[in-house]
Amino acid sequence: LFREFQFDDGVPDTNRLLTPEQIAEMEADTTIRWEGSEVEFTRALIDATLQHAGYSETLIDRYAQNWDIERIALLDRILLRMAIAELITFPEIPPKVTINEILELAKRFSTDKSNLFINGVMDSVYEELQKAGSIQKTGRGLLDS
């Protein structure tokens, strides 16, 4: 999980992968029951997000018109990075599903206008990735945006 937290030393730590112990502490109030395949997918998505972080930041900066990338809400940047990584890395997930899921997460966990901002950026990013041939989807119906 990516989060911005302030740990015992009082220093904010951004974009840190949490340890299993830290996750367990966060889940103390709300238990999350993960299936094996969900854990596997989550780890793969985190790895892909980290692997493509530089490229994702370049795309976000390019299409977040009139926004300083450092002023974009941290959660919005993380969601955008995750969506870009998922588009590039997971051939079995339709682009429409990736974008819709990220928008739902933004509506639920970020600011009131985050989903509109993310949708605008992702439309442009998706178009560029598609033109560049960076999105390789396999399976029936997966090439539709």
Feature locations, PLM:
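N-terminal interaction/assembly modules
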Residues: L1-S145
